[in-house]
């Protein structure tokens, strides 16, 4: 059942990278309030 774990890890990493790029492209929220 190692294939399942590897697939999950790969999908998770890809998803995180995709989300990061997607949220980085449209800078609508100003970064002046800290968090």
Swiss-Prot record:
Keyword annotations: Chloroplast, Membrane, Photosynthesis, Photosystem II, Plastid, Thylakoid, Transmembrane, Transmembrane helix
Main location: plastid
Pfam family, one: PsbT
Residue spans crossing the bilayer: 3-23
Signal peptide region: none
One GO CC term on file: photosystem II reaction center
Compartments (UniProt record): Plastid, Chloroplast thylakoid membrane
Entry keyword Thylakoid: yes
InterPro entries the UniProt entry points to: PSII_PsbT (IPR001743), PSII_PsbT_sf (IPR037268)
Keyword 4Fe-4S belongs to the record: no
Organism domain of life: Eukaryota
Membrane protein topology class: Single-pass membrane protein
Protein task: Found at the monomer-monomer interface of the photosystem II (PS II) dimer, plays a role in assembly and dimerization of PSII. PSII is a light-driven water plastoquinone oxidoreductase, using light energy to abstract electrons from H(2)O, generating a proton gradient subsequently used for ATP formation.
Self-association and partners: PSII is composed of 1 copy each of membrane proteins PsbA, PsbB, PsbC, PsbD, PsbE, PsbF, PsbH, PsbI, PsbJ, PsbK, PsbL, PsbM, PsbT, PsbY, PsbZ, Psb30/Ycf12, at least 3 peripheral proteins of the oxygen-evolving complex and a large number of cofactors. It forms dimeric complexes.
PANTHER family: PHOTOSYSTEM II REACTION CENTER PROTEIN T, PTHR36411
Family membership noted in the UniProt record: Belongs to the PsbT family.
Protein name: Photosystem II reaction center protein T
Origin species: Thuja plicata
């Amino acid at each position: 059942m190692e294939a399942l774990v590897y697939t999950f890890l790969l999908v998770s990493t890809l998803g995180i990278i995709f989300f990061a790029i997607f949220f980085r492209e449209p800078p609508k929220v100003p970064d002046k309030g800290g968090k």
